Amino acid sequence: MLILRGAPALSAFRHSKLLEQLKQKVSAVSGLYAEFAHFADVNDVLTGEEQQVLDRLLKYGPSVPVQEPAGRLFLVLPRFGTISPWSSKASDIARNCGLTKIQRIERGIAFYVEGQFSDADAQAIADSLHDRMTQLVLGDHAQAAGLFSHAEPKPLTAVDILGGGRAALEKANVELGLALAEDEIDYLITSFNGLGRNPHDIELMMFAQANSEHCRHKIFNASWDIDGQSQEKSLFGMIKNTYEMHSEGVLSAYKDNASVIVGSVAGRFFPDPDTRQYGAVQEPVHILMKVETHNHPTAIAPFPGAATGSGGEIRDEGATGRGAKPKAGLTGFTVSNLQIPGFVQPWEVPYGKPERIVTALDIMIEGPLGGAAFNNEFGRPALTGYFRTFEQSITTPHGDEVRGYHKPIMLAGGMGNIREDHVQKAEITVGSKLIVLGGPAMLIGLGGGAASSMATGTSSADLDFASVQRENPEMERRCQEVIDRCWQLGDRNPISFIHDVGAGGLSNAFPELVNDGDRGGRFELRNVPNDEPGMAPLEIWSNESQERYVLAVGVADYERFKAICERERCPFAVVGEATAEPQLTVTDSHFGNSPVDMPLEVLLGKAPRMHRSVAREAEIGDDFDPSTLDIEESVQRVLRHPAVASKSFLITIGDRSITGLVARDQMVGPWQVPVADCAVTATSFDVNTGEAMAMGERTPLALLDAPASGRMAIGETLTNIAASRIEKLSDIKLSANWMSAAGHPGEDARLYDTVKAVGMELCPELGITIPVGKDSMSMKTRWSDEGTEKSVTSPLSLIVTGFAPVVDIRKTLTPELRMDKGITDLILIDLGRGQNRMGASILAQTHGKLGRVAPDVDDAEDLKAFFAVIQGLNSDGHILSYHDRSDGGLLVSTLEMAFAGHCGLNLHLDGLADNVSELSAILFNEELGAVIQVRQDATPLVLAQFSAAGLEDCVAVIGQPINNDEVSISFLGEPVFSGQRRLLQRQWAETSYQIQRLRDNAECADQEFDALLEEDNPGLTVKLGFDVNEDIAAPYIKTGVRPQVAVLREQGVNGQVEMAAAFDRAGFNAIDVHMSDILAGRVDLNDFKGMVACGGFSYGDVLGAGEGWAKSALFNSRARDAFQGFFERSDSFTLGVCNGCQMLSNLHELIPGSEFWPHFVRNRSEQFEARVAMVQVQESASIFLQGMAGSRMPIAIAHGEGHAEFRNDDALLEADVSGTVALRFVDNHGKVTESYPANPNGSPRGIGGMTTLDGRVTIMMPHPERVFRAVQNSWRPEDWNEDAAWMRMFRNARAWVN
């Protein structure tokens, strides 16, 4: 084993943060140093040259001074007997670089902690430094040899029910955490007595997972008595009623991993499977929709819990039909009170929590990062979401109890696209190969299905922890690339059946696969790819290692499928074959036995149906009189409540421009304020049709009136999605995610009544279907605190997500008030019809109250009329701005519109109230509704349209936006409230800022927060030195000659399709080229005029961002010669964007004229930054930027490592004067800047892109390929038609070729 010291592992900011955390745990800690340590398992002595290559491979990341370590060593390594995702990627890179003597490379972090401390202190320090699920801590480098030792497999065990009877099974139930119910234990004893043998532990675990509440939805399928009355339908039956009443537009419901609805016809853009040339295929592009929850894991370990929640939902989409493509994501969090240190709010009363779960604040720091990191690395934009906190002590008939979200809601959802011919799964033929695609088995996430089905606190802490999985998004990206290559083959698609691997691991996925295909299966356990060979059969079969799919591939299609996997470097294995008889057999060649041999009907068959006999409880509530409150203090409290406050800290960490198909993200207008009501994507690059999604949830209302909370969730979804241009209301389809503390007094009846209100009444009245959903029935946390039994129970929680095809993505409305449209009016549409019900409002919550009467949807006809009028007015161009009314009420809606429009407000409430005591209720009630801005000369027409639709009593003109910073509200001519927009926006932004300060580099957070005080910030602007609507490539395109450009990707790259689309539009033939094609000699770069290295996370950024990719080219002789030859050709050009920019900067030794280039390292904020930034094009030789010098315009950025690091100040100066700086970040005034967030990565002198001395090779961190169409820009000038300014760059390349 070779031991190689690595670079320091912590930046100055992370170092001081960790040191502070350690000191809080152990006060004797006085110092800390951390560096990477690398360990290589070699089968022979390396030559001097090989050693040199290895040393260069392991030198990566920013230049931080190396120290001589002092203090006690805590060496954190991957758990022995496992192979970390880092190791498998780094070992792949080493092999690609010709280091064949290296069996495996592994990495740890050596923490040196100074101070005098006891063994107990040392244990506390070790606990803080590692994740015990995947890591261990040693005190000596030499002990790391255990990384490469091979454990012997553990044997199978049987449970003796023939001898020990029921007691033996009950004991196994507790020890294995199976969560079996009494009738399930009876069922298993009967079944195995019938088979005449004892069950194996693996069979019991498999049964427990497949039949857990998580997988079987027993409560939703149960029969019900309420108050002694038998109920006609099950919960699921009432949801299905929506489909039975209105099934039009739904292509698949209730039977697959996601639901499918009808989309639009467009030119679906992808590479031809045979020629690899990108092109558009005109066909129906249908929409798939799915929303999942991952609540239990997120409470225990928020980063991996939320990451694997997102990953699982993405796999659900990809595994729909015969393979589909995920497109855009959403995320949601509901937690208890945050209690931010130094920023605790008056309503946040500390109650405590059990040891086994983390705090609400920790969930909101780590969970969103986990979800965002997975989406970012996979390559899916995160475009909408919600965030709510709720924790309150309430009085019930049983005494006081705390209601809240110690067990959080973590929602991960999204939409994708699927081909018409692939919506339904195909037949699994007998003999079909049953394949696992993706990562290896590891002892991760055991028993997750059963664990998440229990109330938190009813299982052991170790079992809770064991049930959390860990993530490897780059592996999932490779799997998706395989699925994409398969569906792109059309009727030659080798996949006949596919499922994702989720709860229960293979023990649930393979039986489900063969059972759904009306087959049985014969499997060999040792064929399962396994990075932890010491596992017992139960652990191999039931672990929940992520990033895996199971597929059935016909024998005739197998070779085609195998070739695709090899090109994409995606691991797969044939684990079994499909049989005609419905028997499940798993053999084990190592031990020569059969751990599983049972009829599928025992596993998945007639387990007893649950019956629920429950009673309704009296509704609860308290007196709340808003008229007695000070309005100014109310405003401050409401603006700081997390459900109302800015969600910026949740948004800028997530890529929102990847795919180049995003038409509306959360950030609105020239000042990029996070207030959008819905998310919108384009169907493809050649059309203006698309898809919209929006969310609705009003969970605290359920404490007062559960059915009202369900109706309001649907209502809010509709008032949100109404901002997009949708043909008709019935085009909208809903996902319903139900969370309940089943068994808690009154909650089961509340659940039943709410499902009935939604499924049997409101949705049928609206003509809307719920074709997909999910339930989580154990939303309660129990613990003992110094002998006192405590619990926190969630309110019944329905989270609704709406999805719909969009007829024109250019007509999406936003809350940005327009000050360039003459005199305008603000009109309130109040669907509460003046009732102003204040129950469970944010205002009530910020005073520790609930109130008594909840807002509600009183009449479905009003909602239908509202939607139709808004769509008509939008179609006719009458609405300038739109925002729904929700949390915080009318005051918050109008303020958010003013924040987005950077203007003041003059509101008068005369038409809404009879006397001054009603004003608080008018300003803060959360009845359904919206505020629209219209030109004053159109106001009579707009009011008339609402009147004609029967909404005359719902509409009122409430004021005007004004062109200054003042917000004033009056009643009968008397001032009610006044304030400065800037200061109100700071209050609204402060909660987000406080969390950002704790999580990221505090200096950057301070700069961004202080920028809100700037009075004359003009926002994003465009100043062009060319005509955006001129196509300079047109004459060359007319010749019919289309030069070839190689669209280059490596495993983990995810930005290739939009890059190809931009070059294709500019008149090139874009060809899909994988690095594996170059290494294998399948592709010759001499065939290409141009090459572009695309964005993403090559090798998951292992060995540095873009560095592993670059080194696999530098140290592989075939690849090195190919690249060097290409760069030296005077007729070739090259572009590198984001990850491609990082990669090319590491190839500078092969690129003539690139000696001034920097190395790109971690952003100064220490965070992934996804924003719209202003850049200025510099005078340079870049062939891409000719005729653009001096132009200033916005561009999409999305990266974690974009900071340009030069060797020293002299090197920076040389670069500056060499004329090779191509782009610089500027602030909104057009000045070159290093300040955050205008310069999102802190690069010196604003450097954002470089070129070579002759201009043939250009690299940049921003993403022009994501904003080449006008509609792809989050904000754009109105005179941009189809093309955006960045299209010029690609056309310049086409003109240069001629």
UniProtKB/Swiss-Prot annotation:
SUPFAM superfamilies: Class I glutamine amidotransferase-like, FGAM synthase PurL, linker domain, PurM C-terminal domain-like, PurM N-terminal domain-like, PurS-like. Mg(2+) binds at D677, E716, N720, D884. Its main location: cytoplasm. Keywords: ATP-binding, Cytoplasm, Glutamine amidotransferase, Ligase, Magnesium, Metal-binding, Nucleotide-binding, Purine biosynthesis. Residues 1045-1298 form the Glutamine amidotransferase type-1 domain. GO terms for biological process: 'de novo' IMP biosynthetic process. It is found in: Cytoplasm. PROSITE patterns: GATASE_TYPE_1. Its EC number is 6.3.5.3. Pathway: Purine metabolism; IMP biosynthesis via de novo pathway; 5-amino-1-(5-phospho-D-ribosyl)imidazole from N(2)-formyl-N(1)-(5-phospho-D-ribosyl)glycinamide: step 1/2. The keyword Hydrolase does not apply. Signal peptide: none annotated. The active site is at C1138, H1263, E1265. One of its GO terms (molecular function) is phosphoribosylformylglycinamidine synthase activity. ATP binds at residues 305-316, 384-386, 676, 886. CDD domains: GATase1_FGAR_AT, PurL_repeat1, PurL_repeat2. It catalyses: N(2)-formyl-N(1)-(5-phospho-beta-D-ribosyl)glycinamide + L-glutamine + ATP + H2O = 2-formamido-N(1)-(5-O-phospho-beta-D-ribosyl)acetamidine + L-glutamate + ADP + phosphate + H(+). Residues 303-327 are annotated as: Disordered. GO terms for cellular component: cytoplasm. InterPro entries: Class_I_gatase-like, FGAR-AT_N, FGAR-AT_PurM_N-like, PurL_large, PurL_linker, PurM-like_C_dom, PurM-like_C_sf, PurM-like_N_sf. Monomer. In the N-terminal section; belongs to the FGAMS family. Phosphoribosylformylglycinamidine synthase involved in the purines biosynthetic pathway. Catalyzes the ATP-dependent conversion of formylglycinamide ribonucleotide (FGAR) and glutamine to yield formylglycinamidine ribonucleotide (FGAM) and glutamate. PANTHER family: PHOSPHORIBOSYLFORMYLGLYCINAMIDINE SYNTHASE. This is Phosphoribosylformylglycinamidine synthase.
